[in-house]
Amino acid sequence: MHVAPVGPVETAHEEPWATVLRVPLAEGVAWFKACAPVQAFEPRLTAELYARWPDRVVEVIGYDEDRAWLLLVHAGMPIAAKGNPPEAWLAALPRYAELQRGEATFVQDHLAHGVPDLRVAVLPARYEDLLRHSLPLGRDDIQRLRTFTPRFAELCGELAAHGISETIQHDDLHMANLYAQDERLRVLDWGDTSISHPFASLVVTFRFLEELNGLPPNDPWFGRLRDAYLEPWGRGLTDTFALAIRVGTFAHACAWVRQRDHLPEKARAQFDSTFTVILRLALARTAD
C-alpha cells in the first residue's frame, strides 16, 4: 500500500534491534518500523496476528517481509501514560489469552517464518547455552545457575507434563506495549515473541507491576490478574501457572542472551544493566 507523508518524517526510536519513524499523514499519524535481523520475523508476524485478531492487535497498513519493514496506524495511548493501572491488565489479559489459544494452530507456520523456538522441550539446551556465555554476574552467582542445571531440566519436564499447548509468547508484555484507543486495548511490539509456554508471558507483566507500581509479591492484584488470564484456559491451572512463571523466568533470560548476541559491543553495557536484573530474578527462582 502506498502512503504519502504530509510533513517531515521524524525518528522516534532508534535502537540496535529496531528503528521507529513517525510518519505524518493526511488522516493522522503512522509509524514505520525497520527491524534488525534479530527481529526480522516481526513484520510478517504482526500482519498475521492483525489479520486474525484485529480487535486486539494494532492495525497494519503494510509490511515488507524481505526488508523487515512494518507500517502501523497510530495505536492510541500506552497505558504507561496512566501509570500502568492493574485494571487495564484485568481487561487485557483474558483477551490476550484467547489470542494465544487461537494461535496454537499456527505454531509450525510461525516457527517456519523465524519466530524463535523456546518451547519447553528445548529450554534445557537453551539454558546450557546461556551458561556458556560471559554473563554480567559474579562467579558465585554463575556457579549457582550452573548447579541448578539438572533441576531446571526436571522442572521443564514437569511443566511439559501439564499438557498446555505451546504458542505465541509475547515476552515483552508491559505497560509501554499495551495501548488504549476507543475503549479497546491492543498489544503491539511483537519483536521479542517466541514460541513457548503461553503462561510465561506474565513474567514481564508481573515484574513491571512490582517495579513500577510497587506492588509487593503477595498483593491480591497478582491473584486477580492470574485468574483473569487463566479463565480462557480452563479450571485448576493455578499450580501450572506458578510452575510456568518459574520456568519462564529462566526462558526470559535465554531470550535476552539471544538479543545480546546480536548487539554491537558498544551497546552491551547499557543492555547488561537490565540483563543483570533479569538474571537476578532467575537466581531467585533457583531456590526450592
Name these PLM-found stretches.
Residues M1-E10, E42, R258-D288:
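Regulatory N- and C-terminal appendages and interdomain linkers associated
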Residues R146-T149, A153, F222-L230, D272-L283:
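Hydrophobic core segments within long, regular secondary-structure runs in both alpha-
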Residues E10-A26, W31-F32, V60, A153-L202:
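Active-site acidic catalytic loop and adjacent metal/ATP-binding pocket
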Residues M1-A4, T105-V115, R119-H170, Q181, ...:
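An alpha-helical support segment within catalytic cores of ATP-dependent transferases
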